[in-house]
Amino acid sequence: MGAKEKLEAMLNVALRVPSIMLLDVLYRWDVSSFFKQIQRSSLNNNPLFQYKYLALNMHYVGYILSVVLLTLPRQHLAKLYLYFVAALLLYAGHQISRDYVRSELESGYEGPMHIEPLSMNRFITALVGQLVVCTLCSCVMKTKQIWLFSAHMLPLLARLCLVPIETIVVINKFAMIFTGLEVLYFLASNLLVPFNLAKSAYRELAQVVEVYGLLALGMSLWNQLVVPVLFMVFWLVLFALQIYTYFSTRDQPTSRERLLFLFLTSIAECCSTPYSLLGLVFTVSFVALGVLTLCKFYLQGYRAFMNDPAMNRGMTEGVTLLILAVQTGLIELQVVHRAFLLSIILFIVVASILQSMLEIADPIVLALGASRDKSLWKHFRAVSLCLFLLVFPSYMAYMICQFFHMDFWLLIIISSSILTSLQVLGTLFIYVLFMIEEFRKEPVENMDDVIYYVNGTYRLLEFLVALCVVAYGVSETVFGEWTVMGSMIIFIHSYYNVWLRAQLGWKSFLLRRDAVNKIKSLPVATKEQLEQHNDICSICYQDMNSAVITPCSHFFHPGCLKKWLYVQETCPLCHCQLKSLSQQATGESGSSTNPVSEQSATNPPLGPVSRAEVTTEPLAAVPTRSALEQEPTMDIKVSGSVEKRIGELEAHFSQGEANLNSNEVLQRLQAKGEANPEDLNVKALPPECEHCAEI
């Protein structure tokens, strides 16, 4: 984005902020109390204020005008502001002319001005002011006809011509009328412009809705108006005005405790309307986004933005603040109560930001510990951030206990802080284990189990903390004041933080226990079998000093296969089902009733092989890597008719003749005259290769 585009984007936001401020003022304005004040004042006899319903309608018209100003295109909005500036300049010219005429009437001097220094000074000052006004008006309206804005210079010309003072007053009134007529002519000539704009806007909106739908229209308006940035700038302006008003009326210095109270009360003052509350929501979202971006930049530098340029974070914290503010009726409270409730909500938002920071730091820290990167600066940044995430949540929980009376909401904040510290402890412990393994010459035995036990320990502690929170909430609901909102929070907290965590932990425990049982049920390869196999582990691609043999006669490291079985219950190579001893016994009892089981054991079927149909062959028949490298290659050429007939025969074999091997299939095809030796150019295979191909 170039400098011009950035300037246009800034103007697009800055020109729309007054419309949001006008909406906020109209929401604060109480029309009924306003008319009661007028009835007590001297303005009650003014005919303008005697039509209450007309003023009420003007109040709603103000809302409509604010929305129109908010949704106008940027070019038309800039023109409107320029016209408004021109009107202000004309009013300034009128004020200069009126003040000059009044000063001349008070002096009573009607002679030549060069004789009277004071009269000359008044004339020069008024003349310079009128020239500046005319020049600025011509620049704003982009016209060279400067005489259109010089009507207020007529009293000055009359005074230069020694016209009597009474006549100058009449000339000044004529200049005012002439300027007013010019303004009315301009308004009349542009009277249909709003109608034409509304007509064209309606036509464009109808086309967009017809082609893309309402959702696309809403997203387009959201992006064009830059709603988050617009409300954030609006709220920051309100907050700055509030701080300026406080310090401009205070002469004494403010203490640190007073500054904290001032900060909270200023935020509370800027949350009294729905528009200012939305501004605070978007401001918190951008602050959270900035903190998380700085966190990732601190850990990874500029590489953090190469893989994650969008950084769509921060909205969770803003939505959390909005939901809590709406549910608790934040904008309807008094300022002091609003500041107290807002402090609790901000604590919840800070706890959510800390949890998001941990979600960013955890994979980066663990990846840094597992890698061989020896940069001390990278490790220092990772460890220092983890230490901050360990200490700050604990300090925040301590401060909450010191300044607030304990209730269910505060207990949720404290539990969230404690859980964050526990997660950081687990991350640091695993990082230390990775670093110890890095400095050792040999890998640590059962490192995966150690990491699992560490994760399981702090997951169990998280579960216990969540369970304590639920127990406290239930006791407070039963013996204290019962509310629907509190019951909903307890139910949601119980489901997500207790039930789902318990279910996930139990499922992980069962998977690991089943994987351990499967590994124990597999035979361990001897040294002669490993030498005869002469291969590497297909999972880690390392030489095998120890291995287990699967039912499908594949060799793997016990630790590698156990990690694989944590994810899925199949062989990594052929994807046969690997079952435990109890499941194998069940499968064998079911397969004993099969009349063709013995034949299937000797001659495996063509096609997919299940685990119940696979038998452990003698290791001499299992093909090794050296044996396969010495075998000749196969050159198979099958015609279309033969391929079709093979499919039919396979379907026939699956119904009761599954004991036929590939050689018998070819013999049957040749006996029926449906296959010639030229069509099937298959070299003879050794028994072990044929067995491998069938599996």
UniProtKB/Swiss-Prot annotation:
Q: CDD domains per the record?
A: RING-H2_RNF145
How does the protein associate with the membrane? Multi-pass membrane protein
One Pfam family this chain carries? zf-RING_2
- Annotated Gene3D superfamilies: Zinc/RING finger domain, C3HC4 (zinc finger)
Give the transmembrane region(s): 53-73, 77-97, 123-143, 146-166, 168-188, 225-245, 275-295, 316-336, 340-360, 384-404, 410-430, 460-480, 482-502
Give the UniProt subcellular location, in the record's own words: Membrane
Keyword annotations for this protein, in alphabetical order, are: Membrane, Metal-binding, Transmembrane, Transmembrane helix, Zinc, Zinc-finger
Mention one GO molecular function: zinc ion binding
Q: Where is this region: Disordered?
A: 585-610
**Segments forming a coiled coil:** none
- Identify the GO cellular component terms for this protein: membrane
Q: What is its main location?
A: membrane
Where are the zinc-finger regions (RING-type) in this chain? 537-575
Polar residues: compositionally biased ranges? 585-603
Protein name per the record:
RING finger protein 145
**What species does this protein belong to?**
Xenopus tropicalis
